[in-house]
Amino acid sequence: MSEDTSNSTHFGYKTIEAEKKADLVAGVFHSVAAKYDIMNDVMSFGIHRMWKRFTIESAGARPGMKVLDLAGGTGDLTAKFSRIIGDTGQVTLADINDSMLKVGREKLRDKGIVGNVNYVQANAEALPFPDNHFDIITIAFGLRNVTDKDAAIASMLRVLKPGGKLLVLEFSKPQHDIMRKVYDLYSFKVLPKMGSLITKDADSYEYLAESIRMHPDQDTLKQMMEDAGFEQVNYTNMTDGIVALHKGYKF
C-alpha cells in the first residue's frame, strides 16, 4: 500500500500535505549542497566512506554494465562505479535536486571523470528511463527523503533488468539501547550545532535527524521491497544498525 493515500506525509516530525514535501526537501538540499561533502565527513567522522565502500563491493559491478546512482548527489558512488564499469559501461547520476547535481557534476569533472557518466534530474517516484534498462541501482541516503517510498521502489523495479540488483543504503535503527541513547544525543544536540557552524543552517540538519527517525526500520523496509516484487531481499547492519544496506533482486 502506498504511504501517500491520505494525502499527507512527514517532513521530519511534522505532518504536511504530501504535495508540499518535494519542495521542502529541495529547500534543504539547495541550502546544504555546497558544504554537503564536508558535512558528511564531519558528522559521520568519515565512516560514511566505509559504508559506501561496502555498498560498492556488494553491488558486484563489472565492465560494460549500466548503473543508476539514484539520489546520487555529489557523486561519491558514481565516481567509484565509473572506474569499475569502464568505457563500455555507463553510470547515470540522477537526483531530484539540481543544486546537488551541479555540485556532483563539477566534482567529477574536476577528477577527470567524464566519459561514461551522464546526469539526469529525476524524481525517484517516476523514473524517466525505459523498462529493464539498468543492471544495478543504488540509492544512498536518499530514500528517506522521498514522499512516496512505495512508488519509488516500484519505479526502481521497473527500470531494472531481470537479474538486476537494487541496493538501498540508508540510516536505520540502532540495535542496542546504549547506542540508541548516544545516537539520539548526537543527532539532536550535536548535529544541528555542526550544521549551524559549517553551513549556517541548523534547521536543515535538524530535519535530517528527524527524517532518519521517521524512516522505516530494517524489517519494514525489507517487507516494502518484497511487496514491490523484489526477491531474495536481505540487509546488513553497519555501525550497530545506524546504517543498513538492503539488497534485492529482480527476476
Curated annotation (Swiss-Prot):
InterPro entries: SAM-dependent_MTases_sf, UbiE/COQ5_MeTrFase, UbiE/COQ5_MeTrFase_CS
UniProt: S-adenosyl-L-methionine binding residues: 74, 95, 123-124
A GO BP entry: methylation
Pathway of action: Quinol/quinone metabolism; menaquinone biosynthesis; menaquinol from 1,4-dihydroxy-2-naphthoate: step 2/2; Cofactor biosynthesis; ubiquinone biosynthesis
The keyword Transferase belongs to this UniProt entry's keyword annotation: yes
EC number(s) stated in the UniProt entry for this protein: 2.1.1.163, 2.1.1.201
Family (UniProt): Belongs to the class I-like SAM-binding methyltransferase superfamily. MenG/UbiE family.
Function (record text): Methyltransferase required for the conversion of demethylmenaquinol (DMKH2) to menaquinol (MKH2) and the conversion of 2-polyprenyl-6-methoxy-1,4-benzoquinol (DDMQH2) to 2-polyprenyl-3-methyl-6-methoxy-1,4-benzoquinol (DMQH2).
Protein name: Ubiquinone/menaquinone biosynthesis C-methyltransferase UbiE
Lineage: Bacteria, Pseudomonadati, Pseudomonadota, Gammaproteobacteria, Alteromonadales
